[in-house]
């Protein structure tokens, strides 16, 4: 059996920009993408803690170390600058892999810089 499991998440990131006129996606600081093992164009789910919105999109790299979290395209209607979000990536795993897999959880501070928890 195959299972759809959480691979990683960036927890409580703060939206730094929203660009309605971009084609789509979420721009994420390249450093955070690497820490969370999220590749460019990988599908991610975004959960907005402020308003309860949830949506799927794909990740694109932002400038390394910038703290950028920018919601692009139509999804910009679902988030505002300053909103707190969770960005989740998933992977398909067989039962044995899923039982032993430990997802990467990246906590960030108010500037979207990684912190140890």
Swiss-Prot record:
Species in which this protein is naturally found: Thermoanaerobacter pseudethanolicus (strain ATCC 33223 / 39E) (Clostridium thermohydrosulfuricum)
Cell compartment(s), UniProt: Cytoplasm
InterPro entries per UniProt: Asp_de-COase-like_dom_sf, Asp_decarbox
Keywords attached to this entry: Autocatalytic cleavage, Cytoplasm, Decarboxylase, Lyase, Pantothenate biosynthesis, Pyruvate, Schiff base, Zymogen
Protein name: Aspartate 1-decarboxylase
Principal EC category: lyase
Its biological purpose: Catalyzes the pyruvoyl-dependent decarboxylation of aspartate to produce beta-alanine.
NCBIfam families: panD
Swiss-Prot/TrEMBL cofactor(s): pyruvate
CC cofactor note: Binds 1 pyruvoyl group covalently per subunit.
Molecular functions per Gene Ontology: aspartate 1-decarboxylase activity
Pyruvic acid (Ser) PTM positions: 25
Entry's Gene Ontology cellular component terms: cytosol
Assembly and interaction partners: Heterooctamer of four alpha and four beta subunits.
Major localization listed first in the record, in broad terms: cytoplasm
GO biological process, one term: pantothenate biosynthetic process
């Amino acid at each position: 059996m195959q299972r759809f499991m959480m691979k990683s998440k960036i927890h409580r990131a703060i939206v730094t920009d929203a660009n309605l006129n971009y084609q789509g996606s979420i721009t994420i600081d390249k450093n955070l993408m690497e820490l969370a093992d999220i590749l460019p164009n990988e599908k991610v789910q975004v959960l907005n803690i402020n308003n309860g919105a949830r949506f799927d999109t794909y990740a694109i790299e932002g400038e390394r170390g910038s703290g950028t979290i920018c919601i692009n395209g139509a999804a910009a209607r679902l988030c505002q600058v300053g909103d707190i979000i969770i960005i989740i990536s998933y992977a398909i795993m067989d039962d044995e892999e899923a039982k032993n897999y430990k997802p990467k959880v990246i906590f960030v501070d108010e500037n979207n810089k990684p912190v140890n928890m």
